[in-house]
């Protein structure tokens, strides 16, 4: 096995410095380092073909893509076609083992050995030298060839019918070897040649002769180009060496640098000289296009004695070159020698030039470093002979000075490879793995090489070109795409491609790669302070990427410089000039001497001669002025016109065709230079001198002829026209095959468009105004120099934004000759308005005759008739009916086009054929004017002045009031109607503003939020010792991995909701939650004392730990949740971070220490630091602390920490969410689509409110401005039980006034009876229910003894209406604070007076699906009660009762249930709402089942027997309430997946509210009793647990109605099984299945009975011992 380069280096280190060998091998040190890469055999005279036996393996097997023989093989049937790639490369060679070579050389001694031995020694030494003369890194990049072939062959979408193979030939850097190998590979069947590297001219010519492609990845020969026929099949992926100088010229041009000097070394004379010659040619080329020429001031060619330019002689030569040129140049250029660049920069810095206006630009064609730190350490600034810390740590080191000098340096390099690309990483790894195919073992520290990318791109471009040819020619067996080299190269050139380097490159039409280059400048970077890091760089500035050079749209021009985030940091803030202001020698600032006597004489003579010529000149100017005006006044510079390419149309009636937002063409190619292929017509809009103008194209089939003098006079006359009813002609643009007419833009379009728009209602005012404007304009044109229009038609009558008609498209008689149209139909259509004498029809061709003034009168008559009919000329565009006895077809149809041509021909042939006026309902004088205008005798037609006099009766009204006054009156009415709509939108805006403020106050502390709302900056603030809490979930990664994302989100939401409800009890601030981490602080932003805040955090931590012990993961109910808690006390800094989604965040070591306390803690324990322990011990509040001992804390060292085990005398009950008015910050989901909410038209958000509803809105607007306002709540009892909401904008259940209580108590008995009664059709109700899709029933609980007094009179300002009630989404808590503990069991609940009529919602527009009513989301206006109907009387309302209540978060909706009791001795029950076919809500029907949702592949499904058992209640219960089957009721059932049964899951949030409303537990039915469980449950047990919660005060908090398992009682957690309703059944099917079940309400008290049994259900028994409170009365609903 050949040794790797690292092994060779290690061997050399041991070998070279052994005694007796140092002198011999010192000069060969670098030889042996590179020789580690020389591994294969190569004879200088002959190169044998690769042997399949000697070929290294590809992974575990042989290389399947290396050709096994140079003999062609016939493909087998079914095999893929093989494409053989010839790979020619000069790989370094060395015969034998590298270590054996070194040993043999060491053992040789020229003084002791014979001449033959010395000759052998010399031969071996020459072989190593020959190895180094070739490119050593070629063998390193050759693996990219195999990587590309493997990837292409494995790509099923790229040339799937072909397989690539390659044959390799080692040219050894010899041209004759390369030519011979080329011929051998061609004879073996090679279809494409990749390579060779240096000289490829011969190979390119040979490939072109065989029409085979050759793609080079290294050849830089400037003489090879596809422009030459001999190299037509040549392309290369490596940019020519001189391509980078285009970027240099672009940089010079960017900063207006025109003069520069060049310094370069001639060590590699031919290469550097060729680069310089390329630069000279580029300067000469650019000077052809530049007014200010580029100039190379000096050229210094230096030759150095040492490669590292370390000798004093070399340094002196550079210094002399700078001193000799510094007086004539400011900009220096050097290239391809970084040592020269570094030395020049150092010398210029020592001479002080870098602090002046001097710049050094370095161009590096071979830059190949990975990042800025590598390039600083190894390439640009550091002396690589010294150690890193010697370079950068010493302030006076040469390397530190170099960094200061670099402010006056720039560098242009090939854009570095994007190493962060996963694609490149995979490619380079594969290329390294395949190196052994070419005799190289890849070293671990071998860095990437750009040549490998060029080699990969070459193979991939070839494969893509073959793929395009295969797709183009399909299955044509007669065509072999691999043999058509020119076609392959044609599909490679002139295209951009994505290089493996990570950016776009392009191969131009000459076959040369354009390259991609970047600019480096002195920039600020992040330092690397770790000295053990190979990239150690402790400085904060370096030469870093600043800009890239982007290819210009004109590909032959210089690239554009495109900067990144930062600009060049100039030394003086601006780029230095390339020469001083006064020149290098002050030649630009020399004082002018006194005029000589001769100069004075000459000036006098010139003045006299000027006076003599003045007379002649003035006369000549007068004569030429007219000619100049004649030829220029109509001409428009096309560069001043910017075409509008897009816009957002404003479709309001005030602006029918105007674009509110316009986009202009941004391309640098002039729009007018692209000759369109369409015919004559409107081009569109444009901007001309900041004004919108209209464009119209006149297209020609040839170049337009030059304008005659008469045509120019006509254009001048048109340009001088100025009249309100004549469209301003601005000029024309003469293009290659067209003439573009530029005119004033009219936003309303043409009269033809207005008349065709059926949505516009044109009254007499509009018609008279249009006709008057048209006549006035024609009178003005006929009186002008034009004398006639010549092309009058309704499409040329334009309407301005002020509804004024302007005549356009007049004149241009000569320009209209020979114009082209899109189709013949457009020609015939233009003649519809033309007089018969003004046209000639010859066969299928219609030609215009010279126009006359009388022809304009004819055209006016046709337009006049068109205005009144609005059906086009001759009623061509009428949609129905008959036109002149024939059925009129639809516009733009084939029949209509034929009818147009037929009509024009009939007008031309029949002098009496005119439009029919018999059905026009107009005055006789109008018809007389029409007939006179289109008289068959042109001389009998009236002039326009006569027409104006005859139409005076038509214009009588517009003389009193113009059209704009008429429109103003219409707009005033429209504005009045819009005021009500604005009021409504203002209310919504204020509501959304309130939501936004509440949202900000929930995201940030109130004090910080107030500062932000006030527009103030939040200044970071340092706090004295505060206490910080951290916690996270133990095993969260495992839980996340075994759960779905939705389950994880639901779990975290529930857990953090529990935490949030706890922390509200303490003076703390929740900082943030990141994943499973929870961070809380006390003392920020309001600081009190250190002891107080530590106590608050400690109590909160104990409380949270207590709550977590009783918490279960929703989807893993049998698995306990464990968390770690950490606490620490110390100072910190807090402030708002960021502008987008600002966060109030803590900073400091205290945060880190608190996090360490948590991460080093244990599950279900509180870990605190010694600082927190000291504070808690000092306050002596009974905290139980236990010393844990000394612990090694990361980043802190040894720390003594403590366990906080609790607080003496404190126990925490199950946590229920706090009672709190949560601001309604979340907008309703249908807010934008719901339309108006005040009884206006629901179908459009732009429709206007009615007069009645507008009064309500105005009162509401006034009420919204008041604070702390009581609001009226309206509800209505239903005959079948429950209450129907009559609407309110508040969010809380009602509370009663004292005056209302007695009236309600007297009639409470009717409430329970009404629940079981049948539903009666309400005939007294005038209105529907307030919200048909969101109705709810509720129980009005008895308020506390202290009640507010209801106002004696009704105040209009207290009215507020809402459109919808909003249901509770999943996971949201219902506020049940209105249930009072003392009143629930002891006090009576008032009922609604039974003399109030029921307002059963009237069923409207809905579809019934399985017993559900699907209502329209926008209610009709009749659903809202009248304002007067709701204000009749203080006690008994006309349609309901009014109660005042405070704001709550959400209103109850369908499925909510609350226990109620009529009196102390009466029966009790519950009111529960559900969906009904006749309304949105009604009393719960126990036989109803909810429709199941559609299934998904991952949902849990249960067996059919489980379904039946869960639904059939009677089959599950025994006489004592126990379960019959243990198999059906399980604590944690294992789901079984099945696809034929319904899914047991909630079909909607409504089902959860049905289930959650039950007092017997959320997830477990009240009959559930699992004998295998330790704890059993009965109906009374569930009731007992519910009332124990009420007694414990939990009713004053938010009830958690979404807990997964059942409630936890005193003896532990009761297991439960989730009962879910399902199925899609109609009401009849449910009755057949469930029999005659009815909603039964039973009640009992311990004083009346020991065991209560419902007579209708003998299976239900309730033991009296399970009642928790003797004073409590049980309320139960059975289904």
Swiss-Prot record:
Residues that span the membrane, as ranges: 593-613
Pfam families: ANF_receptor, Guanylate_cyc, PK_Tyr_Ser-Thr
Residues involved in Mg(2+) 2 binding: 1032-1033, 1076
Keyword Membrane found: yes
Entry's EC annotation: 4.6.1.2
Binding site residues for ATP: 645-653, 696
GO cellular component, one term: dendrite
GO BP term, example: cGMP biosynthetic process
Annotated thermal dependence: Optimum temperature is 20-25 degrees Celsius. Loses activity at temperatures above 35 degrees Celsius.
Phenotype of the disrupted gene, per the record: Increased body size and increased formation of dauer larvae. Double knockout with che-2 rescues the locomotion defect in the single che-2 mutant.
Chain coiled-coil ranges: 961-997
Class of enzymatic activity (EC top level): lyase
Catalytic activity: GTP = 3',5'-cyclic GMP + diphosphate
Highest taxon of source: Eukaryota
Signal peptide as annotated in the record: 1-44
Comp. bias intervals (Low complexity): 1412-1427, 1664-1679
InterPro entries according to UniProt: A/G_cyclase, A/G_cyclase_CS, ANF_lig-bd_rcpt, Cyclic_nucleotide_synthase, Kinase-like_dom_sf, Nucleotide_cyclase, Peripla_BP_I, Prot_kinase_dom
Biased composition (Polar residues): 1567-1580, 1635-1644
Family: Belongs to the adenylyl cyclase class-4/guanylyl cyclase family.
Protein name: Receptor-type guanylate cyclase gcy-12
Organism listed in the record: Caenorhabditis elegans
């Amino acid at each position: 096995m050949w040794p790797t380069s690292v092994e060779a280096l290690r061997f050399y280190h041991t070998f070279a410095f052994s005694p007796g060998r140092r002198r011999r091998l010192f000069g060969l040190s670098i030889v042996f380092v590179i020789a580690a890469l020389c591994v294969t055999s190569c004879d200088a005279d002959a190169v044998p073909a690769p042997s399949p036996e000697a070929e290294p393996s590809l992974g575990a097997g042989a290389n399947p893509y290396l050709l096994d023989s140079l003999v062609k093989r016939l493909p087998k049937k079914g095999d893929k076609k093989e494409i053989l790639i010839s790979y020619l490369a000069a790989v370094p060679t060395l015969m034998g083992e590298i270590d054996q070579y070194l040993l043999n050389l060491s053992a040789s001694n020229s003084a002791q050995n014979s001449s033959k031995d010395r000759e052998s020694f010399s031969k071996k030494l020459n072989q190593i030298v020959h190895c180094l003369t070739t490119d050593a890194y070629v063998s390193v990049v050759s693996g990219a060839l195999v990587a590309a072939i493997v990837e292409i062959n494995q790509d099923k979408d790229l040339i799937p019918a072909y397989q690539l193979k390659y044959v390799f030939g080692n040219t050894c850097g010899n041209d004759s070897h390369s030519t011979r190998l080329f011929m051998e590979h061609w004879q073996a069947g090679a279809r494409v040649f990749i390579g060779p590297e240096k000289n490829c001219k011969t190979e390119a010519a040979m490939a072109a002769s065989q029409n085979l492609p050759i793609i080079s990845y290294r050849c830089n020969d400037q003489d090879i180009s596809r422009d030459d026929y001999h190299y037509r099949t040549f392309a290369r992926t490596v940019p020519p060496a001189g391509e980078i100088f285009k970027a240099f010229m672009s940089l010079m041009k960017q900063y207006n640098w025109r003069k520069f000097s060049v310094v370069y070394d001639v060590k590699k004379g031919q290469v550097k000289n060729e680069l310089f010659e390329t630069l000279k040619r580029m300067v000469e080329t650019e000077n052809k296009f530049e007014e200010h020429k580029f100039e190379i001031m000096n050229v210094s060619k230096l030759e150095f004695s040492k490669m590292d330019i370390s000798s004093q002689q070399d340094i002196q030569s550079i210094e002399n070159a700078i001193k000799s040129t510094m007086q004539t140049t400011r900009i220096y250029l050097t290239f391809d020698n970084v040592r020269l660049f570094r030395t020049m920069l150092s010398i210029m810095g020592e001479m002080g030039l870098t602090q002046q206006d001097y710049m050094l630009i370095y161009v590096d064609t071979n830059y190949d470093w990975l990042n800025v730190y590598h390039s600083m350490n190894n390439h640009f600034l550091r002396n690589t002979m010294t150690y890193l810390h010697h370079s950068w740590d010493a302030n006076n080191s040469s390397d530190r000075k170099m960094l200061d000098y670099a402010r006056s340096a720039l560098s242009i390099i090939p854009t570095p490879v994007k190493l962060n690309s996963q694609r490149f990483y995979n490619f380079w790894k594969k290329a390294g793995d395949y190196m052994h195919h070419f005799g190289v073992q890849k070293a671990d520290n071998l860095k990437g090489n750009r040549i490998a990318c060029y080699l990969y791109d070459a193979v991939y471009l070839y494969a893509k070109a073959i793929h395009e040819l295969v797709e183009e020619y399909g299955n044509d067996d007669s065509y072999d795409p691999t043999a058509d080299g020119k076609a392959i190269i044609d599909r490679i050139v002139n295209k951009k491609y994505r290089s493996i380097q990570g950016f776009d490159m392009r191969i131009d039409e000459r076959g040369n790669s354009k390259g991609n280059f970047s600019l480096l400048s002195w920039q600020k970077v992040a330092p690397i302070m770790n000295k053990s890091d190979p990239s150690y760089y402790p400085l904060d500035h370096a030469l870093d990427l600043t800009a890239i050079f982007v290819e210009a749209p004109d590909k032959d021009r210089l690239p554009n410089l495109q900067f990144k985030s930062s600009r060049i940091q100039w030394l003086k803030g601006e780029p230095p000039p390339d020469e001083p202001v006064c020149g290098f020698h002050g030649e630009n600032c020399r004082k002018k001497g006194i005029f000589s006597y001769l100069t004075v004489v000459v000036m006098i003579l010139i003045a006299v001669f000027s006076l003599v010529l003045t007379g002649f000149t003035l006369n000549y100017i007068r004569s030429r002025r007219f000619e100049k005006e004649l030829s220029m006044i109509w001409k428009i510079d096309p560069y001043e016109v910017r075409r509008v390419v897009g816009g957002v149309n404003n479709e309001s009636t005030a602006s029918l065709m105007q674009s509110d937002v316009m986009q202009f063409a941004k391309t640098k190619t002039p729009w007018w230079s692209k000759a369109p292929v369409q015919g004559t017509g409107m081009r569109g809009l444009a901007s001309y001198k900041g004004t919108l103008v209209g464009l119209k194209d006149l297209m020609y089939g040839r170049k337009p002829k030059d304008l005659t003098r008469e045509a120019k006079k006509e254009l001048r006359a048109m340009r001088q026209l100025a009249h309100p009813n004549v469209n301003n002609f601005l000029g024309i643009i003469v293009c290659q095959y067209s003439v573009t007419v530029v005119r004033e833009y009219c936003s309303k379009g043409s009269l033809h468009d207005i008349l065709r728009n059926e949505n516009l209602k044109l009254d007499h005012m509009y018609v008279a105004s249009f006709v008057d404007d048209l006549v006035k304009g024609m009178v003005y044109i006929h009186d002008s120099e034009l004398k006639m229009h010549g092309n009058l038609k309704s499409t040329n009558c334009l309407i301005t934004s002020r509804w004024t008609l302007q005549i356009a498209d007049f004149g241009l008689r000569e320009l209209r000759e020979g114009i082209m149209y899109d189709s013949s139909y457009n020609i015939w259509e233009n003649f519809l308005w033309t007089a018969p004498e003004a046209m000639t029809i010859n066969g299928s061709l219609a030609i215009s005759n010279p126009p006359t003034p009388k022809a304009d009168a004819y055209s006016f008559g046709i337009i006049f008739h068109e205005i009144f009919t609005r059906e086009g000329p001759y009623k061509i565009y009428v949609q129905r009916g008959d036109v002149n006895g024939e059925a009129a077809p639809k516009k733009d149809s084939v029949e209509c086009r034929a009818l147009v041509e037929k009509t024009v021909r009939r007008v031309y042939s029949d002098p009496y054929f005119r439009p029919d006026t018999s059905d026009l309902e107009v005055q006789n004088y109008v018809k007389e004017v029409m007939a006179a205008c289109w008289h068959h005798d042109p001389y009998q037609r009236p002039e326009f002045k006569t027409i104006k006099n005859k139409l005076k009766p038509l214009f009588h009204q517009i003389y009193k009031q113009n059209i704009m006054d008429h429109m103003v009156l219409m707009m005033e009415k429209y504005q009045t109607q819009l005021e009500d709509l604005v009021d409504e939108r203002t209310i919504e805006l204020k509501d959304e503003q309130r939501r936004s403020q509440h949202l900000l106050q929930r995201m940030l502390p109130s004090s910080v939020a107030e500062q932000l709302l006030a527009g103030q900056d939040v200044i970071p603030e340092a706090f004295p010792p505060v206490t910080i809490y951290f916690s996270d979930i133990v095993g969260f990664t495992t839980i996340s991995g075994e759960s779905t994302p939705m389950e994880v989100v639901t779990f975290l939401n529930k857990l953090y909701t529990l935490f949030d409800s706890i922390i509200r009890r303490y003076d703390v601030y929740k900082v943030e939650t990141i994943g499973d981490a929870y961070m809380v602080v006390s003392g920020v932003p309001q600081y009190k004392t250190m002891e107080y805040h530590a106590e608050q955090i400690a109590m909160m931590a104990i409380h949270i730990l207590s709550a977590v012990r009783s918490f279960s993961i929703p989807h893993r109910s049998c698995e306990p949740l464990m968390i770690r808690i950490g606490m620490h006390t110390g100072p910190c800094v807090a402030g708002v971070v960021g502008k987008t989604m600002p966060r109030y965040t803590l900073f400091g070591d205290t945060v880190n220490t608190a996090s360490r306390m948590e991460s080093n803690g244990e599950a279900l324990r509180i870990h605190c630091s010694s600082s927190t322990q000291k504070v808690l011990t000092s306050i002596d509040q009974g905290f139980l602390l236990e010393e844990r001992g000394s612990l090694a804390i990361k980043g802190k060292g040894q720390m003594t920490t403590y366990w906080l085990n609790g607080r003496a005398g404190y126990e925490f009950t199950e946590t229920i969410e706090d009672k709190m008015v949560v601001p309604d910050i979340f907008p309703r989901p249908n807010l934008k689509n719901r339309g108006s909410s005040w009884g206006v038209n629901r179908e459009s958000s732009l429709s206007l409110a009615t007069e009645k509803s507008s009064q309500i809105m105005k009162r509401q607007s006034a009420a919204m401005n008041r604070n702390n306002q009581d609001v009226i709540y309206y509800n209505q009892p239903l005959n079948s039980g429950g209450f129907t909401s009559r609407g309110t904008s508040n969010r809380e259940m009602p509370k009663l006034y004292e005056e209302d209580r007695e009236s309600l108590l007297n009639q409470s008995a009717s409430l329970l009876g009404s629940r079981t009664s049948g539903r009666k059709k309400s005939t007294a109700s005038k209105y529907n229910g307030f919200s048909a899709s969101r109705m709810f029933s509720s129980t009005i609980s008895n308020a506390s003894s202290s009640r507010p007094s209801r106002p004696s009179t009704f105040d209009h300002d207290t009215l507020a209406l809402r459109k919808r009630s909003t249901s509770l989404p999943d996971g949201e808590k219902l506020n049940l604070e209105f249930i009072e503990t003392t009143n629930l069991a002891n006090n009576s609940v008032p009922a609604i007076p039974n003399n109030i009529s029921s307002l059963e919602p009237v069923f409207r527009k809905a579809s019934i699906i399985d017993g559900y009513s699907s209502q329209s989301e926008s209610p009709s206006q009749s659903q809202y009660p009248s304002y007067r109907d709701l204000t009749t009387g203080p006690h008994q309302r006309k349609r309901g009762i009014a109660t005042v209540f405070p704001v709550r978060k959400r209103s109850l909706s369908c499925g909510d249930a609350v226990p109620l009791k009529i009196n102390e001795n009466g029966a009790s029950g519950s009111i529960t709402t559900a969906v009904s076919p006749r309304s949105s809500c009604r009393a719960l029907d126990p036989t109803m089942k909810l429709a199941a949702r559609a299934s998904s592949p991952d949902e849990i499904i249960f067996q059919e027997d489980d379904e039946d058992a869960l639904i059939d209640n009677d089959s599950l219960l025994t006489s004592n309430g126990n379960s019959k089957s243990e198999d059906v009721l399980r604590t944690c059932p294992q789901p079984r997946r099945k696809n034929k049964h319904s899914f047991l899951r909630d079909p909607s949030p409504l089902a959860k509210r049905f289930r959650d409303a039950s007092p017997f537990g959320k997830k477990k039915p009240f009959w559930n009793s699992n004998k295998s469980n330790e704890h059993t449950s009965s109906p009374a047990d569930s009731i007992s647990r519910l009332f124990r919660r009420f007694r414990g005060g939990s009713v004053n908090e938010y009830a958690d109605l979404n807990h997964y398992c059942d409630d936890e009682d005193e003896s532990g957690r009761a297991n439960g099984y989730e009962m879910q309703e399902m199925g899609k059944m109609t009401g009849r099917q449910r009755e057949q299945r469930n029999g005659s079940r009815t909603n039964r309400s039973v009640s009992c008290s311990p004083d009346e009975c020991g065991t209560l049994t419902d007579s209708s259900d003998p299976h239900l028994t309730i033991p009296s011992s399970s009642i928790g409170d003797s004073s409590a009365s049980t309320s139960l609903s059975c289904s």
